[in-house]
Amino acid sequence: MSMFLLPVYNIPPAKGFLKKVQTRDCNFNIQLKIFCCLATNQVVSSLDFNQLDCIMGHESTFYTCRAVRRLLLGSNWYPFIDTLNESATGTRGPMYNGPGLIINNTDSTYKLTNICSNKYLPIVYSLETTDMPHEPLAYRAIYFPDLEQTPIDYMCMFKIICRYVTMSELEECYEYFLATVSPPFVNTCKKNYLRLVSALKTLPSTVLATPNPPDQLEFFKFSILSFMQEWSLNSLLNTTKKKIIAAVHSHPHIVIKLCSQNAFKEIKITDANFIEMQQTVNHVMPNFHAEITKRDPGSRPLKVSVLLPDGVKWVIYPPSLPIYRVTMCLASVAAVSSDTITSDKQDIRTASALVSIFRKINYAPKDKKKDMVLNSKVALDIFRNYIAQKYTEEDEFMTYRPIHRLGINNFKVNVFNTNMVINTKIFTHSVPWTYKSLMDIPRLTKNFVFKKYSVKEPSFTVSVFYCENMCNGAAININISGDLLTFLHAMGNMKCYMPIKNILPVSLSNWNSTLDLHGLENQSIVRTGRRDVFWTTNFPSAVSTKLGFNVSWFKAATATISKIYGTSLTSHVTKEVSPIISNNSARLSLLKNNLFSVLESRNRSQIQTLHKRMLECLVALCSFLRLDSHTVRRLAQKGMFDFSKKTISHAKNKHDCALLGYKKCNMIPKVLSFNKKTRLDEHGRNANFLAFISATGFHVPKIRAKLIKHVLRTLGLHWRRTYKHVYNTAQ
């Protein structure tokens, strides 16, 4: 069997012929073969859905739209003389006189001419560009023997079409094709499209079969208990969980009624403790937040009204979590009002049934046999890729590490966390104190901070904010530096002097970081000649605002970054530092960069002012005396220049002050030289040799002058002009 593409002289070729073919067998398989021929131009002897899926392959959308276009053009009867073969005899009808086909039964050739015949072939019109055009005729017709067995059932065709395209894609195909057809076919396409979607006019009113009650109950129990497995492991939820689990097994009829309840039907509860339980769950699991209000929510779904002695409160659950309302109601199962729980089922409306059918078109019919067979090799590859991706992603614990080591074009940068600000809430034990509040102290006047603690080991500060009910809990703000282990240590220490029952999930509100560009000899380029920098009036720094994050550049190539951490911090630092070190005027010393980055990595702290000055002078002298400067780096790698961050405090940092004392921290950054106090960080904590040499070395002027000239010549920094400027400044 084969398909024939026939020329058409006019539309319709056999006007007035209304006889319908008598269906011998209204078999769905024949309709499937008709669709296959209209879509793929292939005539097959036997066909099922799995074979059709293989034929359609990856071009199912294209083939389906081609079949839709031919179905929109419709079918007709073509007059002819003689037969194509023994099985294709056509259908007899009224006598026709006009343009038709004369078919030669020996070689199956045909000729278009005026004929007089009462035989007709069933055909389907086609205007596809993939058809072979018969000039000068613009229309074609398709014939294949399956059309003689049964007429085209448009309802069956719609079911097959929905297997490969969605309803929106079907409408899009219809609209685009209707805009391209000529007037003789416009009305025909509209009528045939209505025939195609006629199944949507008579929507089925049936619902799903009634489930077996024991199986339905087990399904509801499984859903509730599985949802509870997603809850946080917090001791505050233990009592609520026990109540829910007990209610699931002791009140099966309530479980079924609650799960069958309409989302817009309100549930009434007379337990006054329900609001307190819901508030606790909201605090512990902010991602499952339920709204608690005193105002009637109106027609909002998933609401629960709680009858209290002083009025009524409503709890509104997220629309995407109907199981949340059921689970929480089971915590007060004895207080659930039975008159509000009804199992009445509403009639299915037309709109709901139509939406249900569209959803079935989008999802249900797309299951194919090849997709339902588990390919163990493919599944194993997917699992391996998932495991590899899971373990190559940055660990959540390492996201909050206090030091980020970066390599930017072989230039090493260490980013240190100076402090992080964490907000959280605490629940406290009820103890009979004088003021019956969290701290035995009155509220401070005109201050929203109720009390502030400073702890030395580990060093952190805690600010307790005022709230209405200080007996049950309070909001706290924690300022701490270090990693997550340090934070957990601090929370354990905090429980020793505060009556804390439980600490709720924390949120990171701020993260401050700092970095030094070691090895950048002309450090002034970080603040001058940049278009992306604006100056602030109340702070001695140049602020860059790339991507909306502020980077404050101080003198001596020191920067501070706020608000970001983890991968966002590292990517932002890379984008900020790359233009600086790749500048044509930048003079980099990879030896110093390697030396100071090694020291910072070994001691896990930023290098201090005295160490920086000593090593800068040591490297400069080695170069001046023609010695091996890399010896200093090798000694640093062996630990000869290690230091402790507790030895010297280069600024009035709160955490260092807590360890050393405020008086020591105020005095250590200054030294007494020639009866004059000099600040060590006057030129910047990260000042290099050229930055601080103008303020030291006056007792050896000759060596100092030669050393400056040598350094400038080595770096190629226009030594004559720069030397004169540095020398005059020193004088």
Swiss-Prot record:
Pfam families in UniProt: Herpes_UL87
Family membership: Belongs to the herpesviridae UL87 family.
Protein name: Gene 24 protein
Native organism: Saimiriine herpesvirus 2 (strain 11) (SaHV-2)
Gene transcribed to yield this protein: 24
